[in-house]
Amino acid sequence: MERNGISNDTTVIFYGDKNNWWATYAFWVFQLFGHTNAKVIDGGRAKWIAEGRATTREVPKYAASNYKAKERNDEPIRAFRDDVLVHVKAGKPLVDVRSTKEYTGELLHMPDYPQEGALRGGHIPGAKSVPWARAANSDGTFKNADELKAIYEGEISLKKGDDVIAYCRIGER
């Protein structure tokens, strides 16, 4: 962080490909370590390029900064195995954001990727399927609040205030 000129007050902007999967994962990691001054470019790199915005291969250089990392706090944004088991036993909602074929067990990993890294296919009992890509439009931008409500409240019957665990294969979606 320091060698990249990032201080505790720096706004960090993330962007990426594949509907910002990895950008949102990096955003999540920053939240995990208490750096909440972070944003994700809606539409990612693909939309940036489609709009004719400038790109470069030049790596920027910033003056070193001081950064004091906060103590990692998983509690508010991460569920571990035992948390999930308690959640399932209590009948609370889970959302599987992997592809439909991963949810059904037909694939162990996303389509067009090596089928490795998971011990078995399928999903956690009781989980509803809402693939990550459904939260995004075809141009990679995120759907608006009404569109997301139609999916999560209308299609899978989540209610405001529900204690929900969302999961994928390794946490990048």
Residues covered by each model-derived region:
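Thiolate-centered catalytic microenvironments shared by cysteine-dependent enzyme domains
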Residues: M1-K89, E106-L107, G122, R169-R173
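Positively charged, proline/Ser/Thr-rich regional signature most characteristic
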Residues: M1-S7, L85-G161
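C-terminal soluble interaction/assembly domains
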Residues: K160-C168, E172
